[in-house]
Amino acid sequence: YDKVEFHITGXTKDTYSAFIQSLRTHLS
């Protein structure tokens, strides 16, 4: 997720965090 957070550096990062949590649910 480091690469994702690297690209998402701004306001959208907060929204993307929710998307990342969804990925973690599928990957974990």
Curated annotation (Swiss-Prot):
Disulfide-linked heterodimer of A and B chains. Keywords: Disulfide bond, Hydrolase, Lectin, Protein synthesis inhibitor, Toxin. It comes from Iris hollandica. GO terms for biological process: negative regulation of translation. InterPro entries: Ribosome-inact_prot_sf. Belongs to the ribosome-inactivating protein family. Gal / GalNAc-specific lectin. Agglutinates both native and trypsin-treated rabbit erythrocytes but not human erythrocytes irrespective of blood group type. This is N-acetyl-D-galactosamine-binding lectin subunit A. It catalyses: Endohydrolysis of the N-glycosidic bond at one specific adenosine on the 28S rRNA. SUPFAM superfamilies: Ribosome inactivating proteins (RIP) (SSF56371). GO terms for molecular function: carbohydrate binding; rRNA N-glycosylase activity; toxin activity. Its EC number is 3.2.2.22. It is an enzyme of class 3 (hydrolase). It comes from the Eukaryota. The keyword Disulfide bond applies.
